[in-house]
Amino acid sequence: MKDNYRWLAPVYTPLSRMVFGNQLHEANTCFLSNIPNKKVLILGGGDGWDYRGFQDNLTGKFVELSPSMLSKAEKNLKDSKLHFVIGPFDFKEKYDVILLPFVLDTFNDQDLEIFFSKVKDSLNSGGKVILADFFPSQNWRQELMIKTIISGFRMLAGHVRQDLPDYEYFFRSIGMEKVEEKIWKKGWIKAQIWK
């Protein structure tokens, strides 16, 4: 499998913190205090750095397409009870919580439709999805930054999107409802719980 993040893995978290401070970390983790004793699925969790403070509560799977990122995640989350998996996820098990940390903007809309139907089928009764991602920009600076980020990931990591998906449309299309939301940068960065 080609490792599109090989060059990004060593600098991903430091670069993120340099540009956004602690805001992406906060978005990724703001709802995690509610998941003890839950079976979780983390899809595209990168180097796992954000989840280190919660690893005692993490049981389930951590799925990542990049071998470089997965290797870092295994080290960063060595005390968790997560099973680390490289490659596309097969959605054969059921989970209480599915985490989607800044990953959905790597899919085109057709793939998102398929992906979301599988997400819904992978949730236990009463299960929830926690999304953290960028949303439509609120000013020209954010617009310029998101275009730069998207272009950079297209060039360096082979992402296919040229814009941000309409996440809420896809959640609603599978009958899910947003039950909680936290925002940063006037709503440009959001964390949401969907059930």
Can you annotate each of these PLM segments?
Residues 20-37, 49:
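Conserved alpha-helix/loop element of class I SAM-dependent methyltransferases that forms part
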Residues 113-125:
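A short glycine-rich, Lys/Arg-flanked "PGG" loop and its adjoining helix->strand segment in the class I
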Residues 1-23:
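Class I SAM-dependent methyltransferase Rossmann-like catalytic core
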Residues 41-90:
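Class I SAM-dependent methyltransferase SAM/SAH-binding core
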Residues 191-195:
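C-terminal lobe and adjacent flexible extensions of AdoMet/dcAdoMet transferase-like proteins
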